[in-house]
Regions:
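Non-transmembrane "mature" sequence context
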Residues: 1-146
């Protein structure tokens, strides 16, 4: 049985989710933030778009993140970054043309979910639920579903 890297099998072979553990969150936070800002740069996101995808942290908190002063991110923030990373990865699998993969979030989209607007607008306006929906969509497309 395969298990996630942030789970631990305790006595009785029950997997325990460690993602809420502050030590685990601290260990994951700095690399997650660096990855997020690299994706934000590739996608050409504004500061407002970045903050929206991160869950609207205070401006001072956002600037601390940019400076590398991260600490242990909230579980919600780590989840948001994980979703953005998953979307980015799926797009780069779907579209071998790196420029197209990176532009996709800003292109008008005919999918009914987006109503002709870019996926980025949907994600910025829709919060974490929209991030989940876009992640499911690109993963489904990657798996061959339209």
């Amino acid at each position: 049985m395969k298990r996630a890297a942030n789970t631990k099998v305790e006595s009785g072979a029950i997997a325990v989710d460690r993602r809420h553990d502050p030590a685990v969150r601290k260990r994951m936070s700095a690399p997650a933030v660096r990855t997020f800002f690299n994706i934000a740069r590739a996608w050409g996101l504004s500061v407002a778009e970045q903050r929206a995808l991160l869950g609207w942290p205070a401006a001072s908190t956002y600037h601390k993140y940019k400076a590398g002063d991260v600490g242990a991110l909230a579980y919600d923030t780590l989840t948001r970054i994980s979703l953005v990373l998953g979307i980015y990865k799926a797009l780069h699998i779907l579209y071998p043309d790196t420029a197209l993969a990176d532009r996709w979030v800003k292109l008008p989209n005919a999918n009914a979910m987006f109503g002709g607007a870019p996926a980025l607008s949907f994600m910025v306006d829709g919060g974490i639920d929209a991030l989940h929906q876009v992640r499911r969509l690109v993963d489904a497309r990657r798996g061959g579903m339209n």
